């Protein structure tokens, strides 16, 4: 098939809409549902991300996309008991691929609501059962087991979007887009992210473990398919905070850092001990936790409000308690899609437990940035690779 007609483009008034190729066939087959324009942008970007994560790490990978940027991305490492609890997988048998999706979805559950999922490997039953329970628009994978396909086809009253992609497909060397009637042409970004990108360590501390290398590679590959400007915090094989599409680099670092902080706060005893009313939906629980750990916590603790959410009124999670818990988060990796212009980015990263950094370098203030990293005994690599994506 050379062409797929779509219901509409980015918005309902943008008709007609289609995706097509000039030569050969489309690399995708729609097995169920009817994907939208943005769904396919998410699917094709997400597929490239997980394919490269699998190639770089050797482990199954998954990503959760919203509006053409990942909300989460991860490889299939086993989950701790705490992560199983906050990812709603307690008592569930998980395959490596299911672990990858649980991590990708669980990093920023608020942003992943209604996501489009990309999987590096054949979707198995365990992964399909996880997807079944989440609010999601669709999934793309190189294959689906019969049982997984049966489960997914029943989702959303039979309208859940399921796309199979040819894993052997290689895009043309040149890509073209059109804006306001003007065509833009550039070479496809085939740059490979691997350990060679981490060889130029510019800080005094040059000790980079294999796990830290993996985390930095995950950060950089994630950034390659994130709308710029972007930075990505990674811990234990998964993105824990992605700051996308900000005009200011330090605002990326703050946004992603706050997301990483929220991920860590969700694992605190105070949050794990919250007693929710029976029958509360996952989305309502996620929203309540997000408010509870934030500055507007009074909104869920107010009289008449907390009773709809909690069995017992929670104690305030004080600023001092949160600061004490956040100080326990360490061994976080940070990647940036372009250079850090000032040391303030490093200062903010330090607050979220960052110990290793990969960035292109090239700022006129590189010396100041390196000095700030040295102050915290961080390891920082200059890879000379800009990863802008639009």
What are these regions (language model features)?
Residues 1-197, 212-230:
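Active-site loops and adjacent core secondary-structure elements that bind or stabilize anionic groups
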Residues 56-64, 163-165, 228-235, 265-276, ...:
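Flexible, glycine/charged-enriched surface loops at secondary-structure junctions
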Residues 69, 123, 235-238, 246, ...:
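Active-site-proximal loop/turn and secondary-structure-junction residues that shape catalytic pockets
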Residues 115, 119-120, 133-163, 168-170, ...:
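C-terminal binding/interaction regions
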Residues 60-61, 66-71, 75, 230, ...:
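Glycine-rich phosphate/pyrophosphate-binding loops
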Residues 71-109, 240-339:
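Glycine- and Gly-Pro-enriched alpha-helical subdomains that act as flexible
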Residues 22-34, 107-113, 187-206, 284-306, ...:
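Gly-rich Lys/Arg/Thr-decorated short loops/hinges at beta-loop-alpha junctions or inter-strand turns
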Residues 52, 225, 262-266, 351:
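Conserved helix-loop functional segments at active or binding sites
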């Amino acid at each position: 098939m050379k062409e797929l007609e779509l219901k509409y483009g980015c918005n309902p008034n943008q008709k007609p809409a289609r995706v097509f190729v000039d030569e050969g066939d489309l690399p995708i087959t729609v097995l169920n549902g009817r994907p939208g324009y943005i769904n396919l942008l998410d699917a094709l970007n997400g597929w490239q991300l997980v394919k490269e994560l699998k190639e770089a790490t050797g482990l199954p990978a998954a990503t959760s996309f919203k509006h053409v940027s990942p909300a989460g991305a991860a490889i299939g490492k086993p989950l701790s008991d705490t992560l199983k609890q906050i990812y709603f997988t307690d008592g569930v048998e998980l395959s490596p691929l299911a672990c990858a999706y649980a991590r990708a979805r669980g990093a920023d559950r608020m942003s992943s609501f209604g996501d489009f999922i990309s999987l590096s490997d054949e979707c198995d039953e365990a992964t399909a059962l996880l997807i079944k329970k989440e609010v999601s628009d669709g999934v793309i994978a190189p294959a689906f087991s019969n049982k997984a396909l049966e489960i997914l086809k029943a989702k959303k009253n039979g309208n859940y979007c399921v796309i199979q992609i040819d894993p052997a497909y290689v895009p043309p060397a040149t890509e073209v887009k059109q804006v306001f009637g003007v065509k833009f042409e550039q070479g496809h970004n085939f740059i490979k992210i691997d350990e060679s990108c981490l060889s130029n360590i510019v800080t005094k501390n040059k000790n980079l473990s294999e796990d830290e290398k993996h985390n930095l590679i995950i950060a950089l590959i994630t950034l390659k398919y994130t709308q710029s400007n972007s930075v990505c915090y990674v811990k234990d094989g998964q993105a824990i905070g992605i700051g996308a599409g900000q005009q200011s680099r330090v605002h990326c670092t703050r946004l992603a850092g706050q997301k990483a902080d929220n991920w860590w706060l969700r694992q605190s005893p105070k949050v794990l001990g919250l007693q929710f009313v029976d029958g509360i939906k996952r989305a309502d629980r996620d929203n309540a936790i997000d408010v509870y750990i934030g500055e507007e916590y009074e909104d869920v603790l107010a009289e008449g409000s907390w009773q709809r959410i909690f069995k017992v009124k929670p104690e305030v999670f004080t600023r001092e308690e949160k600061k004490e818990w956040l100080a326990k988060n360490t061994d976080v990796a940070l990647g940036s899609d372009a250079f850090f212009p000032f040391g303030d980015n490093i200062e903010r990263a330090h607050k979220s437990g960052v110990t290793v950094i990969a960035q292109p370098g090239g700022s006129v203030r590189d010396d100041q940035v390196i000095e700030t990293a040295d102050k915290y005994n961080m390891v920082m690599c200059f890879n000379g690779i800009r990863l802008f994506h639009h």
